[in-house]
Amino acid sequence: LHTIGRKLNEIKIKKPNQIIERIKRYIEENYQIPEMRLSLIAEKFNFSPAYLSALFKNSCNQNITDYINAVRIEAACRYLIQNEYKISHISELVGYANVTYFYKVFKNLKGCSPRDYLGKYWEGET
């Protein structure tokens, strides 16, 4: 019985981690969708938003919205470095319907505006 109990605990621990990895992969592959948010992901994976929020926060030490924003801003940085698109277009490419909100999130995560980030990149500071 002790062995069975231990195995069940291992399964319980492993399964949430697998779910979280699938959710993270889904976000990383679909961050461009402007509607990407907790409710959409919860529906996709058949969880209540409250349960998914708690599971993600417990496993990743950050909420889903923060994770989505981090993925989007990292993608925006890659687009900025390519120097092929205007910043307003980059905000759309990475899933932000509102360019002002994109600037706010970018500055919050990177400590500077997208334009300043690009300048720092070319100066070798990032």
Per-range role (PLM):
Residues 25, 58-97, 119-126:
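Terminal helix-turn-helix DNA-binding modules in bacterial transcription factors
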Residues 16-20, 38, 87:
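The cytosolic transmitter module of two-component sensor histidine kinases
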Residues 10-21, 54, 62-71:
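Short, Lys/Arg-enriched anionic-surface-contact patches
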Residues 20, 24, 43-46:
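Amphipathic alpha-helical surface "interface" segments used
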Residues 1-12, 24-36, 56-60, 77-86, ...:
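Basic, amphipathic alpha-helical hairpins
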Residues 116:
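C-terminal interaction modules of eukaryotic adaptor/scaffold proteins
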Residues 39-68, 91-113:
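Basic/polar phosphate-binding segments, predominantly the helix-turn-helix DNA-binding elements
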